[in-house]
Amino acid sequence: MGLSFYLLLLCIVSGLVSGVMAMRRKAVLGAAVAMLVGIAGTIGANRLWPLDGFGLIHVFYLAAVVSLPMFLVGGWFGLRRDDRAPRSRWLLPAVATSIVAVGIYATHIEPYRLEIVREQIVSAQISEPVRIVVLSDIQNSSVGDYEYEVMDAIIAEEPDLVLMAGDLWQLPPWEWPQQIHDFEDLLAYLLEGVPGLVMVDGDSDWPDGYDQLVQRVGPRSLFLFDETSETFVGDQRVVIGGAARGEDNSPAERAVLETLVAAPDDALTILLGHRPAVVFRPDASDGIDLVVAGHTHGGQVSVPFFGPPITFSEVPREVAAGGLHEVDGVPIFVTRGVGMERHQAPQLRFNVRPSIGVIDFVPD
């Protein structure tokens, strides 16, 4: 029995307790007892699976979309035959149904509603159009139909180059030998339909795994670990620098930036990193045409008229939410990614659809 099943069962029990007591017109007592059950259960979970911040968020999410609706329905049953109860009691089942619907949508529907985000950048220094597709944060422990649907969507865009901004997988290292073949097949499938793939590492994966994948899928894939690579799209020179996720402003990373800055004036220069904060690196504003990053997942949850409450990034909230922006004079594209945070986190998206980015560079 895993953590997710345990927490779901805990919230069902808590919801039943509070709902039954609310049905008996003891709503306050029921809420108090349910809270005690929840606290005790969370303490028990913490002994079996030491909870991190994502684990606590998971508890609160399930309490909101499972326990609370059961409590509200119980309260409605307790009031529905009481002629003295306010007519507003009929709001209780409506609110409960709405909460459950949001939970189902956020957990089972939106995480798989892939969106294509299109941007165009006009440049006076390039001679030919270049189309780049940005992919990031698949972040799964296994490969399934959804991941292949993402690859089909990328291939359909007919890109000149695909940039992968890290977090290709998220699983314990000891499971990697059993899963590498599936990720190898996934990348090989992608490379059957696109000219090339350039990748950097993220927070949930590791460089050795990328090295293994590149060796297996062939020369049209490339993993950059504080390195640069030069390629051509037709006659258009493209120079890509890959910033490793590790130490910030390391000598190797500074060398990457220096190489990009020193590239010929007619070259298209791109800095690829996992975290958007790579845009703050020294020299990033000195002639780099575009910074590409992932990491934030767009927040995974976005509040209307506010944006994502949590982004785990130093860039402004609107930048972390995804899309093409400018930070300190540097164009940066942050993709919302195609997957979700795993392990202890609640696996959901709300008002933040998964996405791939299609960026067209066109001559002025």
Where are these regions (language model features)?
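Non-catalytic terminal accessory segments
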Residues: 1-111
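Short, structured coil/loop segments at alpha-helix boundaries
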Residues: 23-34, 84-88, 122-127, 144, ...
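Soluble catalytic domains of enzymes that build or remodel membrane lipids, polysaccharides, and related
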Residues: 125-364
